[in-house]
Regions:
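Conserved hydrophobic/aromatic beta-strand scaffold that supports enzyme active sites
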Residues: 18-23, 67-69, 84, 103-105, ...
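Short gly/ser/thr-rich secondary-structure transition/capping motifs
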Residues: 13-19, 51-52, 131-134
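Glycine-rich beta-strand-centered segment in the early N-terminal region that forms part
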Residues: 22-39, 51-92
Length: 192
């Protein structure tokens, strides 16, 4: 058995409880990950309150992103037990149980292997934030090296990631913030 935060239906945040479920069993194309950390996203708040897509069903273990260590794989997997992986989206926490658990079963296609000595709490904040910033720059804006981009909210976590990614990709990045005291923050991250 393992600890999970499983929602039986819509609830307030103070009604969420730790409960027990069996450890999920590996199947072809999927792997079991020991979850070490996960980010908490606004979309999960909508799911918790019953405001998700009509396809979202209860009971459900939330969590659309996470980081951890591969615990078990199916025969023929390209992953190995003990590997560090990040994982996000692809139905995680919506169509099948997510990262608010000690172990989660994920399709291999959403796993991103990495190696890091950073602490798990830091790593756990990176996956979805990075995907959002990257997707905004590259897919939504179609920005490329040499372009100048404006990042509104340049002191938010996603904004700072967009600044860093944009600079690293060869863009000139201009960033805004509402707070005068925070003006140096995006500049320290590389904004012009």
């Amino acid at each position: 058995m393992m600890d999970v935060i499983r929602l039986e239906g819509p609830c307030e945040i103070d009604e969420m409880r730790v409960s027990q479920l069996p450890v999920p069993q590996v199947r072809e194309g999927w792997m079991r990950v020991r979850v070490e950390a996960f980010g908490i996203n606004e979309s999960e708040s909508h799911s918790r309150r019953g405001l998700s897509d009509p396809d979202f069903t209860y009971p459900r273990v939330l969590g659309i992103e996470g980081v951890g260590v591969v615990d078990e794989v199916a025969p023929g997997s390209v992953f190995q037990p003990g590997q560090q992986v990040a994982f996000m989206m692809g139905g995680l926490g919506r169509e099948y149980d997510g990262s608010y658990a000690r172990y989660t079963l994920i399709p291999e296609r959403i796993a991103i292997p990495f190696t890091s000595d950073l602490d798990w709490a830091t790593i756990g904040a990176i996956p979805e934030m990075t995907q959002t910033a990257y997707g905004s720059l590259v897919h939504a804006m179609r920005a490329r090296s040499g372009d100048t981009v404006l990042v509104r909210g340049g002191t938010s976590t996603v904004g700072l990631m967009a600044v860093r990614l944009g600079v690293r990709m060869g863009m000139t990045v201009i960033a805004t913030t509402r707070r005068e005291s925070a003006r140096p923050v995006p500049n320290e991250a590389g904004a012009a």
